Amino acid sequence: MKERIKLHDKVFKPLIPGEEIEKSIDAVAAKINADYEGSGTVPVLLCVLNGSILFTGELMKRLTFDVDLMSIKLSSYQGTSSTGTVHMDMGLTGDVTGKEVIIVEDIVDTGRTIEALVKILYARKAAKVKVCTMLLKPEMYNKPLALDYVAMEIPNDFIVGFGLDYDGLGRNYRDIYVLDTETQA
C-alpha cells in the first residue's frame, strides 16, 4: 500500500488495504452463495459501471452458481461532490424481464443512485431486485430501500481505489485511499 497517492490536484492517504477488501468480498459472496446456491435461480448480476467493475469481477469469481452478467452506466458525481441528479450514461446491456437481479454497486452513500436504479429495473419488469454494495456510508444513507448485501461500512469521506475514482483516476489501485484534507497539493 502506498503511503500517499496524488490524483489531479488532490492527495489521498491509505484507508483500507487490499487484503481487507478481499476478505470482505469473501464474506459477502458467502452470504449470496447461501441465498442462491442450489436454488435453480440464475440471477442477473448487474454491474454498475464504471466503479463496480473490480468489485463485480472479484465477486463473480467467488460465486458458486450461474449468473447472467449485465451492465449499466449511471453517474451522479462530478469531482468530489454529488450532483444530486442521477444520469443514465449507458442503458442496460440486456433484458431483465421476469428475471431476478442483483445490483452490484461500488458505493452507496445517500442512496439516490441505487433508488433510481431499482425503479428503472422494476419499470423494465424485473421479477425481483436485490442490492449488493462493496461500501456503504451509513451516516449518509437515508432511503427506506433495504440493502441486501453490504461488504463494508465506511465513514462519510471521499475515497478512491478498487474501482472508485476522482475525475477518472485512481480506479486501478487494489487498496482504498481517503482524501487527505491536511496535505493538499
Model-derived features with residue positions:
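PRPP-associated nucleotide enzymes
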Residues: 1-185
